[in-house]
């Protein structure tokens, strides 16, 4: 991506010959105890770094205990090697694969801090920078180079460094935004063209793809999104290709995001700030992506104190932050940075984006996590975080938690409710254990029932969306183990008359012990179908159908309830119609039901379904036997 003619570069070298000094002379300006900043991730100046290490090997006493600082390195990190402890001390704001061992052995450092705060710490000299070792594009005709794919904290580092050493590389794209530096501000330049580091995350597996499918159901047309690192975010993006008018305000720009920009899925047209612009702070991808962002005015890179500032994020309408975690407990605390006492990654930008998005108008926060680790041997959903684990996200930071087993909405829920919701999306083989541990810790009811094994696994395939004759769009789905609060709201919102018709007797309450019978079921023997709608962004149960199989007669005993405010809107008709379809698929031949004589609407509903009906009156109620035609 050359931005100038080679002859002009020769002119620059002649004009600024003192800046293109021999490498040994350049590195001789580094002194003992200096703090050296290195560009982030794929923006790492590989040749310049190799040259620095060569200088240290030939001049082993040139300087001592220089502190090497960066967010994250993807390239080699020789300065973290134990043999260079005299010369370097590595200090990272994020722990990567090639520095994790050194950090946990105590021969390298990790500084836990919100990424949005690092530029301020640098600007106020709380984190002083003596030398900035960066990589840039070639200078343009006006004498400016671009930081290209790594702006993040690099901008603050060069604004405050005593010495700036830049490797200029024709392969570094010129990216719009806060990326430009005049060569007058650079102390030394090393011209070396080489391919930029590339980042290719693992191809998403089946688990990641299933998580991505669930997350896509939460993302709406017009949302502005932020995603973290790894194969799961890529799986999420592969599932949103049918969305429209998405925006991006993120820390990290990836290949998958760029592909959606190419397709027009991401166009930033609905953003209320930076409209029409994809905003990011750095990029990790392939050369194909680097070419796309080169001199592309639709993409702007800003300092991480802008992209990650919760005060800015909270002003973005429909901001949706999607980040991953290593472990989450039943109270909603999550760690994305450590496995127990072992440092694994870092705070990163997830806390910045999650907290900003919680406050944004229409904002959402989504935490994605695979249900197990260590090849399925341990659950990532636990009663409480492991001892020593850093709490990256607290109990108020997360709206949705998504595993390959479903979606748990925990925002605004009490500890008991969120514990049950999270158990419901844990790996099935760990659910009984989590139930028992949660009981012992008084997180849930002491008498909480549970059905282990296949019999208790949620049959998601039964979910369907239908529109009633009155135009009401309704989700029909099986009951879940965490639906007790929704069932309680349904029953207690019903009139005494409706309750009497449902339970065939007069009653004022439907206590917890009774409600459990509706939500903890053996799906192979009975079915409870809920009819739900969204009211003010909240799922509300407006109707319920229950069917209990009789294997001897090949029928099912059924009962129905519809919230009073939704009666006469076709909810009951759709419930019985769908329950009939499910029963026929199971090979059942009909229904039985008890209906109070006074319950004319229910009787009429059965009659209009076209069943062959036998009626018998007993103690003020019809005993109905209904055969499918």
Predicted regions and their residues:
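Conserved alpha/beta enzyme-core scaffold
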Residues: 1-452
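Long, contiguous binding/interaction regions
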Residues: 457-629
């Amino acid at each position: 991506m050359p931005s100038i003619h080679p002859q002009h570069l020769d002119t620059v070298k002649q004009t600024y010959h003192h800046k293109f000094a021999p490498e040994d002379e350049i590195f001789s300006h580094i002194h003992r105890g200096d703090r050296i900043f290195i560009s982030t991730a794929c923006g790492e100046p590989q040749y310049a770094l190799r040259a620095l290490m060569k200088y240290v090997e030939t001049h082993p006493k040139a300087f001592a205990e220089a502190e090497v600082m960066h967010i994250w390195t993807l390239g080699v990190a020789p300065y973290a090697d134990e043999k260079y402890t005299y010369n370097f001390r590595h200090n990272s704001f994020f722990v990567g694969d090639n520095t994790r061992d050194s950090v946990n052995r105590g021969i390298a450092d990790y500084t836990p801090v919100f990424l949005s705060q690092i530029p301020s710490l640098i600007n106020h000299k709380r984190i002083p920078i003596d030398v900035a070792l960066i990589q840039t594009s070639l200078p343009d005709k006006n004498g400016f180079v671009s930081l290209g794919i790594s702006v993040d904290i690099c901008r603050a580092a060069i604004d405050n460094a005593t010495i700036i050493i830049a490797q200029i590389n024709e392969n570094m794209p010129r990216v719009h935004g806060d990326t430009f530096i005049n060569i007058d501000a650079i102390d030394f330049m090393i011209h070396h063209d080489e391919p930029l580091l590339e980042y290719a995350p693992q191809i998403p597996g089946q688990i990641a793809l299933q998580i991505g499918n669930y997350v896509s159901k939460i993302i709406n047309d017009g949302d502005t999104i932020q995603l973290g690192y790894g194969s799961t975010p890529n799986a999420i993006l592969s599932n949103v290709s049918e969305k429209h008018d998405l925006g991006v305000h993120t820390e990290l720009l990836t290949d998958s995001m760029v592909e959606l920009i190419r397709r027009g899925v991401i166009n930033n047209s609905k953003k209320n700030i930076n409209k029409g612009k994809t905003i990011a702070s750095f990029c990790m991808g392939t050369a194909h992506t680097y070419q796309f962002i080169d001199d592309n005015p639709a993409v702007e890179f800003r300092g991480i104190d802008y992209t990650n500032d919760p005060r800015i994020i909270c002003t973005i309408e429909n901001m949706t932050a999607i980040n991953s975690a290593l472990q989450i407990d039943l109270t909603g605390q999550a760690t994305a940075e450590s496995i127990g006492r072992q440092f694994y990654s870092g705070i990163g930008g997830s806390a910045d984006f999650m907290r900003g998005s919680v406050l944004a108008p229409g904002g959402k926060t989504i935490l994605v996590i695979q249900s197990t680790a260590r090849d399925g041997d341990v659950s990532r959903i636990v009663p409480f975080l492991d001892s020593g684990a850093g709490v990256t996200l607290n109990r108020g930071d997360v709206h949705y938690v998504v595993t390959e087993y479903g979606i748990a909405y925990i925002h605004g829920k009490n500890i008991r409710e969120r514990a049950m919701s999270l158990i419901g999306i844990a790996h099935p083989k760990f659910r009984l254990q989590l139930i028992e541990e949660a009981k012992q810790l008084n997180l849930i009811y002491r008498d909480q029932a549970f059905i282990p094994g296949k019999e208790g696994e949620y049959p998601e395939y039964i979910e369907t969306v239908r529109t009633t004759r009155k135009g009401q769009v309704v989700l029909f789905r099986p009951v879940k183990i965490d639906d007790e609060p929704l069932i309680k709201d349904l029953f207690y919102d019903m009139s005494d008359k409706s309750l009497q018709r449902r339970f065939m007797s007069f009653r004022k309450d439907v206590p917890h012990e009774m409600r459990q019978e509706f939500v903890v079921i053996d799906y192979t023997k009975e079915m409870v179908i809920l009819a739900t709608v969204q009211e003010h962004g909240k799922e509300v149960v407006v109707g319920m159908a229950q069917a209990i199989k009789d294997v001897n007669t090949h029928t099912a005993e059924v009962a129905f309830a519809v919230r009073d405010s939704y009666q006469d809107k076709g909810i009951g008709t759709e419930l019985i119609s769908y329950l009939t379809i499910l029963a026929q698929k199971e090979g059942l031949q009909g229904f039985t039901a008890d209906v109070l004589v006074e319950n004319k609407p229910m009787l009429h509903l059965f009659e209009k379904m076209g069943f062959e009906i036998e009626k018998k009156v007993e103690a003020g109620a019809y005993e109905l036997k209904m055969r499918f035609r």
